[in-house]
From Swiss-Prot:
Record-annotated active site: D69
Subcellular location: Cytoplasm
Originating gene: maf
A GO biological-process term: nucleotide metabolic process
Protein known as: dTTP/UTP pyrophosphatase
Gene3D superfamilies, A to Z: 3.90.950.10
Catalysis performed (reactions): dTTP + H2O = dTMP + diphosphate + H(+); UTP + H2O = UMP + diphosphate + H(+)
NCBIfam families on file: maf
Pfam family, one: Maf
Cofactor: a divalent metal cation
Gene Ontology cellular component list: cytoplasm
Length: 191
């Protein structure tokens, strides 16, 4: 029996698959993420998702492997995960009072085919005070999240508006993923 393998150690992606009753196992991709010369954020996230899934699929060719990647962009600037407090504060100051875009790319690899897709969501932040930013950064929540915030956590209080898929901002566009899995004869809507 084919298994679904999530090529990610992200606790948020794990929670979203569990929420949707998708049966899966985790094999963390150890691939070094490389961003080449891509023309768009959507190309970047789909390429990174494919890199992660491909690395795990090499040793799991009889199964279905899922890879995903999320980035935040503001005015053509890519905001990944912050490497320190100053970088986290800088990102949050940049996003304060403005609308930014969150892209999550997904790759599904199986013997018979490979599917990649992405979702784009616009998120608008309230104006943030320096104290709000300092307190949030001190909580350590920003450090494993693209754009330095978690919409599903304490960072939720910064969000004024969202246009698009909330779960994509969390890290996995689960409704779209469930529909795409039907191409691989996986239907969790009747489970």
């Amino acid at each position: 029996m084919r298994k679904i393998i999530l090529a990610s150690g992200s606790p948020r992606r794990k929670e979203l698959l569990e929420l949707a009753s998708v049966p899966f196992e985790i094999v963390v991709s150890e691939v070094e993420e490389t961003i080449g010369a891509y023309s768009s954020p959507s190309d970047i996230v789909m390429s990174l998702a494919l890199q992660k899934a491909s690395a795990v699929a090499e040793n799991n060719s009889d199964h279905i492997v899922l890879g995903a990647d999320t980035i935040v962009t503001y005015e053509s600037r890519i905001l990944g995960k912050p490497s320190n407090e100053d970088e986290a504060k800088e990102m949050l100051q940049l996003l304060s009072g403005k609308t930014h875009e969150v892209y999550t790319g997904v790759a599904i690899i199986a013997k018979e085919k490979t599917v990649t897709f992405y979702e784009r969501t616009e998120v608008t932040f309230w104006e943030l005070t320096e104290e709000e930013i300092d307190t949030y950064v001190a909580s350590k929540e920003p450090f494993d999240k693209a754009g330095s915030y978690g919409i599903q956590g304490k960072g939720s209080i910064f969000v004024q508006n969202i246009q698009g898929d909330y779960y994509s901002v969390v890290g996995l566009p689960i409704a779209r993923l469930v529909r795409e899995l039907k191409q691989f004869d996986i239907d969790v809507t009747h489970a």
